[in-house]
Amino acid sequence: MAIRQLSETLINQIAAGEVIERPASAAKELIENALDAGATRIEIATAGGGKALLRVSDNGSGMDAADLELAVRRHCTSKLSETLEDIRTLGFRGEALPSIGSVARLSIASRRRDSAGGHEIAVNAGKVAHLRPAAANPGTIVEVRDLFFATPARLKFLKTEKAEAGAITEIVKRMAIAFPAVRFVLSGSDRTTLEFPATGDDHLARMAQVLGKDFRDNAIALDAVREEISLTGFAGVPTFNRGNSAHQYAFVNGRPVQDKLILSAIRGAYAETIPSGRHPVAVLSITLDPALVDVNVHPAKSDVRFRDPGLVRGLIVGAIREALARDGSRAATTGASDMLRSFRPGFQPQAQRPQTAWSAETSPFRPYQPTTGFSERPQASFDGLSMPTARAEPPFSPQPAAADTTARYPLGAARAQIHANYIVAQTEDGLVIVDQHAAHERLVFEAMRKALHSKRLASQVLLIPEIVDIPEEDCDRLMQHAAELAELGLAIERFGPGAIAVRETPAMLGEVDAHGLIRQLADEIAEWDTASGLSAKLEYVAATMACHGSVRSGRRLRPEEMNALLREMEVTPGSGQCNHGRPTYIELKLSDIERLFGRS
């Protein structure tokens, strides 16, 4: 078969297959063109999930007649001169408009700000109509109808109208986050679905518009520089997490990307703080010399290639971990919101309340009896909190002292322990409820990790060794890693077939459930299959030990023990969540409590 030159229409249709995969791809290209034109207001209208209609209107610089004629021709662009090494605009390929025009019905109306009138041009399945004058406001309106009507086979690969509309919505959200000074409006066939007013330079306000005000309340600012690569943005506290990674946004030199390296770095930064199956919320913006990143490795420009990927990953992981450590005692405010929503009024109006005879015997209420909220019996010593930074508070008094300053601490002053598991503390503007086991577990883990890194993890010799019966294969695995476990203060040895003798345990754990600890460690080592050693997993082992050595649920604490726990939480990084990523405390503001009682 002879080789022949392809027609211009077929070439454009092939290009469309690379650049325009779905309506959202077309929307992305058109929005990028509007942003490159300096628009401050962009309106997107769709019908049929973008297949029947996609219209993008902007108030940008506009085009004159000559520019309009070139805009629908391949490889014509105002954004690229001679090199691909210094790309500073969003769109640059010079293929989007002719590619769209080859598979759809495309019309463009545009007018420059300094022109008295505008012009319009149309492209129908690759056939360009004559340019004509048109009434138009300054800016550009691009309208795409019947996308892929010229290539019906492509329609089979599109998803439902709802799914395609959702993809367009996601594109608009990403663009809106990247450009807070631009007003974005997205409307469907019958209503406005999104509207993001311009917020100027206030990036966090725009993120609150897109991600919700909960993100603003639970975000930690990022600002780091490494070898002329800067990282800014916001990362959610670990307890503010989601069931998927859809709430992770990354931008490189202002360009929205979905780069695997960046997403992997975000996961790595949160690896020890979020439960399995949950994902952090983060918005990252990386700025670097355009020569250090290739944005042309993918037709849709969604992936990039960094010249030094290790440097970028290290910058992201380090910046997020440093921010979490700096503000690590915070827990997500959404816990309080969820709790408030779960409350229901516990009374009935007088008119609806059944009238029954009342007696002291039948009433669910009991006469008032003064109580301090604590057990009056002597308590065991709080061995688990023997860390030097913990400060004991004065003995609790049911009558608040005039000079009570403990409520001025971020986590307040302990007022009661309920169900022998939760500490209720009073702050200056509300109250805090702390899960004592989860909180102490995190404190012990952080102390163990610090001691592990400094090689000063002390152990305590058991007066009588604990003998733990486990399967022979588990014995073999544990003994294979006995030296590494000894680094954590856990000394074990064989004690006959199917048995392990525990002779030493980490001193900071106090009294340890050796049987439960050994069995869980055996299960985890089997799951990890770490034949080469536990060195990469020592912190996970420390987390397991911390869980077994922390204050258990059901243990009653004295007031000074509870206040010592609160003070230690305030100075410990990551204390807002336990080792499994669950929150260690929930804060209720006084305004929230008053709202529950209808006093707002």
Curated annotation (Swiss-Prot):
Species of the source: Rhizobium leguminosarum bv. trifolii (strain WSM2304)
Family (UniProt): Belongs to the DNA mismatch repair MutL/HexB family.
Stored CDD domains: HATPase_MutL-MLH-PMS-like, MutL_Trans
Keywords carried by this UniProt record: DNA damage, DNA repair
GO cellular component: mismatch repair complex
GO molecular-function terms, A-Z: ATP binding; ATP hydrolysis activity; ATP-dependent DNA damage sensor activity; mismatched DNA binding
PROSITE patterns reported for this sequence: DNA_MISMATCH_REPAIR_1
Lineage: Bacteria, Pseudomonadati, Pseudomonadota, Alphaproteobacteria, Hyphomicrobiales
UniProt protein name: DNA mismatch repair protein MutL
Pfam families, A to Z: DNA_mis_repair (PF01119), HATPase_c_3 (PF13589), MutL_C (PF08676)
Example GO biological process: mismatch repair
Gene of this entry: mutL
Role noted for this protein: This protein is involved in the repair of mismatches in DNA. It is required for dam-dependent methyl-directed DNA mismatch repair. May act as a 'molecular matchmaker', a protein that promotes the formation of a stable complex between two or more DNA-binding proteins in an ATP-dependent manner without itself being part of a final effector complex.
Keyword DNA damage in annotation: yes
Polar residues: compositionally biased ranges: 349-362
